[in-house]
Amino acid sequence: MIKLLFTYICTYTYKLYALYHMDYACVCMYKYKGIVTLQVCLFYIKLRVFLSNFTFSSSILALKNPNNSLIKIMAILPENSSNLDLTISVPGFSSSPLSDEGSGGGRDQLRLDMNRLPSSEDGDDEEFSHDDGSAPPRKKLRLTREQSRLLEDSFRQNHTLNPKQKEVLAKHLMLRPRQIEVWFQNRRARSKLKQTEMECEYLKRWFGSLTEENHRLHREVEELRAMKVGPTTVNSASSLTMCPRCERVTPAASPSRAVVPVPAKKTFPPQERDR
């Protein structure tokens, strides 16, 4: 009887609070097995010291569509606690904690606690790795400085390890052989990528030097062609003279190379040519 009276007081308190703020819609509440449920609600308000003085720390909004199946917010009030648990149900997730127990945990349930800040366990974006399909996911491997130093020294000595070396190194570093193998694979991939980047940079510089050398050779070829063709055309008009005897063109600078006139061809009369 006391519990029922307490539930009714809570219900009417919520209604009065909703009517006091006319901007908000009416909030319907009902009692079922000690659980007070908000069927239509937009924002969930954290309540402080609820059992002592019924004071509210913020406001409550109602959804416009009460049959909305995308979001259902349940406020669970334990008997001996002043904190509220928030359960948000979305498609693919269960809306009640009892359904998961009855179905054997076939669907997952997303639970949020408004009384504390989300921790790293609630939303961890770190990478996970699987040894096989049945193994649970585990977080990305975090190495200490000493472990990293020993692994780097081992990698400098040998880029690949046999199973026996993996066992010895894993035992020394307190790791699993599979983790040692994965670390060496990643290290070889990083080393190969670094070497490829260095080779690409070297080839770029070499290509630039060859391009400059090619341009320089082209300029030299053009200069040589200009030097060979230019003076020849100038001297050909100034150093040639006309010989009045043979009417031939001879160079004036070299008289010893004068062309000897060729005698005219002797012609015969028609009678002698017939003989």
UniProtKB/Swiss-Prot annotation:
Record bears the keyword Plastid: no
Region ranges (Leucine-zipper): 203-224
InterPro entries (UniProt xref): HD, HD-ZIP_Homeobox_LZ_Class_II, Homeobox_CS, Homeodomain-like_sf, Leu_zip_homeo
GO molecular function terms listed in the Swiss-Prot or TrEMBL record: DNA-binding transcription factor activity; DNA-binding transcription factor activity, RNA polymerase II-specific; sequence-specific DNA binding
CDD domains, sorted: homeodomain
DNA-binding region: 136-195
GO annotation (BP), single: response to salt stress
SMART domains (UniProt xref): HALZ, HOX
Segments of this protein annotated with the region Disordered: 95-143, 252-275
Short name of one Pfam family: HALZ
Source organism, top-level taxon: Eukaryota
Cell location: Nucleus
Keywords of the record: DNA-binding, Homeobox, Nucleus, Transcription, Transcription regulation
One cellular-component annotation, GO: nucleus
Entry-linked Gene3D superfamilies: Homeodomain-like
Described purpose of this protein according to its UniProt entry: Probable transcription factor.
Recorded family membership: Belongs to the HD-ZIP homeobox family. Class II subfamily.
The protein's name: Homeobox-leucine zipper protein ATHB-17
Organism (species): Arabidopsis thaliana (Mouse-ear cress)
